[in-house]
Structure formats: C-alpha cells, structure tokens
Amino acid sequence: MKTPITEAIATADNQGRFLSNTELQAVNGRYQRATASLTAAKALTGSAQRLITGAAQAVYNKFPYTTQMPGPAYASSAIGKAKCARDIGYYLRMVTYTLVVGGTGPMDEYLVAGLEEINRSFDLSPSWYIEALQYIKNSHGLSGQVANEANAYIDYAINTSL
C-alpha cells in the first residue's frame, strides 16, 4: 500500500541510497501530523453512524427522486436505503483508513480503482456520493489540524468521485 513514507523508502531503495534529508524531513512531517490524523480517524469512527445517517438524508433531500424511483440503484425501499447507507459508510471507512496510513493508498487501491465501473454498472450517480461526503465534511465537528487532516482526505474522495 502506498503512503508518502513507503514511497520515499521505495525510491531511495530503488536508487540504492539512504533517505535524503528532504525525504527524512517529509517523513518527520508526517509523524508530526500523525496524532491529528489518528484523532480524526477515531472521531469519525465514533461518529460514523450519525454521519452516515445524516449524509444519506442529505442525499435524499437534495435528490428526492432517489427515494421515489423504483429499482436497486434507488432508496425507495428499506433495502435501497440500507444500500445507500452501506455505500456512504464505505467511503467514510476509506477516509479513516487514509487518515491512519497518512496517504491515499487505501482509497486509491480499494475505492478509486473500480469506482467508475461500479457506478456505471449499477447506474449510480457520483453526485450522490459527493453530496454525502460534503455533508460529512460540514458535519463532522472536528476543528484545527484534526479537521484539516480529515478534510484533505474527504476532499480527495470528492475529487476522485467526479
């Protein structure tokens, strides 16, 4: 799994050298931000159910047809609503994983790689997930560096969903 630290190590190793001062400074910077990232991951995990429920409702409010259209891609039934919440939860989990490792590797490997194909196959609109992620970003209740760390990965998820 790629993280800024593993990438720096891989580059140095491929070139048969020790980490440069610049690379060591980047690694040190990551460790300095790690506490904020772990705090954000813990807070998002602790608030996951509230955030997922609120995000799903934000999607239904902005796109009311999602609760009125029949079919497996819509939330017109309890099963459809459960699928929507499950998918939002998956995005939120990926955000927490990226926070823990300090890089987009988990999201790139487990989410982004097949996202377009999944959305197309199941006729899912990226705008639904963008709305859900915006809700999470605006409602997580984090502040300072903790919020900055979380928001960076939420924004990454939003931008890769486009």
UniProtKB/Swiss-Prot annotation:
Keywords: Antenna complex, Bile pigment, Chloroplast, Chromophore, Electron transport, Membrane, Photosynthesis, Phycobilisome, Plastid, Thylakoid, Transport
Transmembrane segments: none
Keyword Chloroplast: yes
Entry GO CC: chloroplast thylakoid membrane; phycobilisome
UniProt keyword Nucleotidyltransferase present: no
Classification via InterPro entries: Globin-like_sf, Phycobilisome_asu/bsu, Phycobilisome_asu/bsu_sf, Phycocyanin_a
Annotated membrane topology: Peripheral membrane protein
Residues where (2R,3E)-phycocyanobilin binds: C84
PTM remark: Contains one covalently linked phycocyanobilin chromophore.
GO biological process: photosynthesis
A Pfam entry, by short name: Phycobilisome
Subcellular location field: Plastid, Chloroplast thylakoid membrane
Purpose: Light-harvesting photosynthetic bile pigment-protein from the phycobiliprotein complex (phycobilisome, PBS). Phycocyanin is the major phycobiliprotein in the PBS rod.
UniProt-listed NCBIfam families: phycocy_alpha (TIGR01338)
Family in the record: Belongs to the phycobiliprotein family.
Oligomer status and interactors: Heterodimer of an alpha and a beta subunit. Dimers further assemble into trimers and the trimers into hexamers. The basic functional unit of phycobiliproteins is a ring-shaped hexamer formed from two back-to-back trimers contacting via the alpha chain subunits. The trimers are composed of alpha/beta subunit heterodimers arranged around a three-fold axis of symmetry. The phycoerythrins also contain a gamma subunit which is located in the center of the hexamer.
The protein, known as: R-phycocyanin-1 subunit alpha
Source organism of the structure: Porphyridium purpureum
Upper classification of the organism: Eukaryota, Rhodophyta, Bangiophyceae, Porphyridiales, Porphyridiaceae
